[in-house]
Each structure stands twice: as structure tokens, then as C-alpha cells.
């Protein structure tokens, strides 16, 4: 109950913050800021190593894809697009992914900055390993999940107590180990909303160049799916996604907020199967929900694959040293390919601009 009260208070505070921003139709572009919320798990964090990005930006075979992001051999730092990614913030450039890495936010933010006269702020709320089923579970799904959480917690507490009776040190694989302790449902959803509130409340402190401007929440981008492949969570992904979209719009106070979904596609050129295919189909099915017509757009990411990273046994970037192969991470992270992440960011941007154009 206490958690519920705190969440309601957070939603009220966010709605009040957003209400201070003028509606898009009446916005004075000289005094507003376009804000885009980017959420998901590790791939929304961004997994393309900067060392590999630097290399491909100078390699004659790949440099054309990145030339608009560079000037005089260096990465451009935007003075009209800003980003907040958890504890980090600043003008948009490379490096706003996981440590020493970059994600789809770079190309997406570039496109938004080039399209709008107003400054742009990206709020990135992403945490590796978090599922829509659990951590990103939205409020309208919580009541039915709370019972399961209590059951899981009771089971774990019993196992934990039994393990402690065997000795103070609990084996790593013992079901009573802390790593198996059930996590609260909706924790990342609430943290995501808190990121929005913090940015709206403290924007002028975070980004002094935006002093005196009003923030306008303009769109949402979702890039997630991997952790819903387990425990049968994929079977309810479509329902969970529908609830999530509706709840986000309700809690942020923007009824038809443009919502882009980068559908799961780590399979690349290999046909998707099993839970991965189920999740992708659920994500793509959002295009067919009648009430989402014209305000939700899902697209496939597997068709954007950087095929060079699918070569047998690609060598990774290790210990900061670039071993000149195109893959910078494992398959679950889109091979850590700067090309793949850039293509995904571009597709995100195209989808967002299409939705926004249709709403005018």
C-alpha cells in the first residue's frame, strides 16, 4: 500500500510538471524544448564500443554512414540536442551508451535535432536485464502480479532460511541465495517516470542553455525484449505492451504520445524462432491495434543487420584494443555493431517523424 501511495504521488507530480509545458499546437518554438523519452534494457543503453565506432568512422568502407556526425576528423558535439542518461548528462555526442559505448540515441537524437527548430532533450531510462513482464510492468498489470510476487517471496524466504541453517555462507546456486530473491514488479517503470520528473524539474540546472524554456514531451521510443524470453513471459508480451503504452500515456498526461517500438531482432539474417519470434510478433502487432493507428509505430531491427558481423567467429574489442573485426559484443547486443545501432537509431527517427507528421 505504501508503494502504491508513493507511486500515485509520483504520477501526480509528473503530471503537474508536464502540465506546465504548452501544448504542441500552441507552442512557441522560441521558448520550448522537444523532449523524447527512450526506454528499455541493455540495447537501449547502447553497446557499440567507441573504439570500433572511431575505426569505422575512418575506414573507407564504412565511413560514409557516419560522416554527418563528424567534422574535421572529430565527432561533433551538438549545441542544440542534450541527453540525460541516469547520472550522466550533457550535449549529445558519442559515448552516451554503456561505459565507453554508444547506442541508437546518437543517430535518433541527430535526426530530431536536424528536424526541429527547438532544442531537443533525450531522457534515456534503460537498465540491462529488465523485462516488460516484471521490472517494466505497468500499473494496470500490477494487481494480478502482486499476488505472484508475494508467493515467490514466501518461497524464497523459506529457501533462504533453510540455507542459513546449513551455515552462514549460502552456496551460489542455492535457491535461497540473494541472487534469486524476487524483484518487485514495476520497479523500472517507476524509475523511468522518476527520470522524467527529475529532468522536467531540474532542466535549467542540468542544461543551462535551456534556461527560460518550457519542456514539451514529444515522443517515446521502446527498445527491449531479451529478458521476456524466459519463464513463459513471451506469451503475454502483447498484452503487457498494450497496457504499458496506455499506462505511459496516462501517467505522463499525453493521451496520444507518439510511441515507437524497435522490435526485437538479434537473430539478424537467421530466421527468428521460439520466444524471440513470439516477442517480435507481439511488438509488431501493436501496429494493428485500432486505437494505436497513427500514434504507434513498430519496425523490425533484424532486417537492418550489419551482415559483416555475422562472419564466423568475429573477434571482439578486448581490453580497449581494437581487433579489426566489425563485431564489438555478443549477439544479444546486436554484435555491438556501430553500423547496426546507427541504422536502428535512424529507423527510430524515421518512425517518430512519421508519427509526429501524422498528428499535425
Where would I find each of the regions flagged by the language model?
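Bacterial N-terminal signal peptides that target proteins for export
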Residues: 1-9
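Bacterial N-terminal signal peptides
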Residues: 8-17
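Boundary at the C-terminal end of the N-terminal hydrophobic targeting segment
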Residues: 19-26
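Cell-envelope and extracellular/periplasmic
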Residues: 26-360
Amino acid at each position: 500500500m505504501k508503494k502504491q501511495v508513493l507511486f500515485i504521488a509520483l504520477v501526480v507530480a509528473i503530471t503537474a510538471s508536464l502540465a506546465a509545458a504548452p501544448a504542441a499546437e500552441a507552442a512557441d518554438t522560441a521558448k520550448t524544448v522537444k523532449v523524447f523519452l527512450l526506454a528499455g534494457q541493455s540495447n537501449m543503453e547502447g553497446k557499440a564500443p567507441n573504439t570500433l565506432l572511431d575505426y569505422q568512422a575512418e575506414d573507407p568502407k564504412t565511413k560514409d554512414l557516419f560522416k554527418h556526425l563528424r567534422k574535421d576528423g572529430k565527432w561533433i558535439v551538438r549545441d542544440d540536442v542534450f541527453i540525460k542518461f541516469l547520472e550522466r548528462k550533457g550535449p549529445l555526442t558519442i559515448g552516451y551508451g554503456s561505459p565507453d559505448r554508444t547506442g541508437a540515441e546518437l543517430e535518433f537524437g541527430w535526426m530530431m535535432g536536424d528536424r526541429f527548430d527547438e532544442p531537443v532533450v533525450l531522457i534515456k531510462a534503460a537498465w540491462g536485464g529488465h523485462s516488460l513482464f516484471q521490472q517494466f510492468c505497468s500499473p494496470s498489470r500490477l494487481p494480478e502480479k502482486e499476488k505472484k510476487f508475494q508467493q515467490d517471496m514466501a518461497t524464497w524466504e523459506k529457501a533462504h532460511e533453510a540455507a542459513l541453517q546449513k551455515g552462514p555462507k549460502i552456496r551460489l546456486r542455492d535457491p535461497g541465495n540473494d541472487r534469486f530473491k524476487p524483484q518487485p514488479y514495476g520497479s523500472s517503470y517507476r524509475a523511468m517516470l522518476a527520470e522524467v520528473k527529475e529532468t522536467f524539474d531540474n532542466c535549467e540546472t542540468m542544461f543551462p542553455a535551456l534556461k527560460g524554456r518550457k519542456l514539451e514531451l514529444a515522443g517515446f521510443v521502446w527498445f527491449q525484449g531479451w529478458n521476456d524470453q524466459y519463464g513463459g513471459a513471451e506469451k503475454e508480451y502483447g498484452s503487457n505492451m498494450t497496457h504499458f503504452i496506455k499506462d505511459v500515456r496516462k501517467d505522463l498526461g499525453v493521451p496520444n504520445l507518439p510511441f515507437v517500438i524497435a522490435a526485437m531482432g538479434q537473430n539478424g539474417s537467421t530466421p527468428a524462432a521460439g520466444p524471440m519470434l513470439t516477442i517480435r510478433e507481439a511488438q509488431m502487432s501493436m501496429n494493428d491495434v485500432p486505437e494505436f493507428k497513427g500514434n504507434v509505430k513498430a519496425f523490425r531491427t533484424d532486417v537492418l543487420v550489419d551482415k559483416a558481423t555475422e562472419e564466423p567467429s568475429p573477434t571482439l574489442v578486448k581490453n580497449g584494443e581494437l581487433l579489426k573485426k566489425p563485431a564489438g559484443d555478443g549477439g544479444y547486443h546486436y554484435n555491438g555493431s556501430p553500423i547496426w545501432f546507427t541504422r536502428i537509431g535512424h529507423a527510430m527517427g524515421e518512425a517518430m517523424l512519421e508519427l509526429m507528421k501524422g498528428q499535425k
